[in-house]
Regions:
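Amphipathic alpha-helical transducer elements in NTP-driven molecular machines
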Residues: 9-12, 42, 46, 53, ...
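Switch I (effector-binding) loop of TRAFAC-class P-loop GTPase G-domains
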Residues: 1-24, 70
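Conserved, well-folded catalytic cores of nucleic-acid-processing
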Residues: 18-22, 37, 52, 56-59, ...
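Conserved C-terminal guanine-recognition region of P-loop GTPase G domains, centered on the G4
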Residues: 19-25, 29, 44-118, 189-194
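Conserved nucleotide-binding/hydrolysis micro-motifs of P-loop NTPases
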Residues: 8-10, 32-35, 65-69, 94-97, ...
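Flexible beta-alpha connector loops of hexameric P-loop NTPases
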Residues: 2-5, 34-42
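Canonical P-loop GTPase G-domain recognition
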Residues: 85-88, 95-157
């Protein structure tokens, strides 16, 4: 449902993913990672996550088992009120963790969340995801299905087009620049064949503009080419994509810009 990247804090919105089988409908709500914010964007992301945590029947806390417990983990525990909600703690990337270090990490969480259920996973390989689904089923209260069975997410095509473009940028650039990038869809000509997509890549500094474009425009052409392929899979038709890079200074701290780019938390 959301983009994947080795760079942290890439999920910026609450995203619903809908699971259906012959027994149940499970609505998963993927939230931005809770963190100590440096800009208003980070505060908005945290607010989305805090709000979601209060509105769920089961909370799932995903922990990177390959990394030791740190200040960021403690920050999440201190700020996320999930002690009254049935809790599953998922230790993902368990295949990359040393056994003794993984047990040490689990002991830390077990001391804090005494009633939590622990599940090891390797999400990328699908390992133990069936156990996670089974456990969620057992914890959920009975109720009506909220969405049609053919729905897999609450997000529309424009949202996914933006996320595809952003994902390709993340794969092309270093750690610092991607956090200051937003995507704005200027126009989509749906009636045109192929579909015409005009999008702006928003950066905060003039120097970042050149980094995104690359020497002779090589990088932005590659971003556009990779994005086009995935967007065509999404829309199941050919598309033309035009990408422009624009500067919006300090947009991560500007309320109007945050709202324009879809990152303003609304209660």
């Amino acid at each position: 449902m959301s983009l994947s990247s080795l760079i942290s804090l890439t999920t910026r919105n609450n995203i619903i993913g809908i699971y259906n089988d012959n027994e149940v409908q499970i609505v998963f709500l993927d939230t931005p990672g809770i963190h100590k914010p440096k800009q208003q964007l980070g505060k908005e992301m945290n607010n989305m996550a805090y709000s979601a945590a209060h509105d769920v029947d089961v909370a799932i806390l995903v922990v990177d088992a390959s990394k030791p417990f740190g200040a960021g983990d403690q920050f999440i525990i201190d700020h996320l009120d999930i002690h009254k909600t049935p809790l599953i703690i998922v230790f993902n990337k368990i295949d990359l963790a040393r056994l003794d270090k993984a047990e040490e990490l689990k002991a830390t969480y077990r001391a804090i969340f005494k009633k939590a259920i622990f599940i090891d996973t390797v999400a990328k390989e699908g390992f133990n995801i069936d156990t996670l689904i089974k456990t969620v089923k057992e914890l959920l209260p009975e109720g009506p299905a909220y969405y049609p069975t053919e729905m897999v997410t609450d997000k529309d095509e424009i949202f996914h087009i933006k996320e595809i473009i952003r994902e390709k940028i993340l794969k092309q650039l270093s750690e610092e620049v991607p956090h200051s990038i937003a995507i704005y869809i200027d126009n989509i000509e749906w009636e045109h064949k192929p579909v015409q997509i005009f999008a702006s890549i928003i950066v905060e500094k003039e120097s970042q503009k050149g980094i995104v474009i690359g020497a002779g425009g090589k990088r932005i052409k590659e971003i556009g080419s990779q994005a086009r392929k995935d967007i065509e899979k999404l829309l199941k038709q050919h598309v033309f994509i035009d990408l422009q890079v624009k500067v919006d200074a300090d947009w991560r701290n500007e309320p109007l810009s945050l709202k324009t780019y879809g990152y303003k938390y609304e209660k």
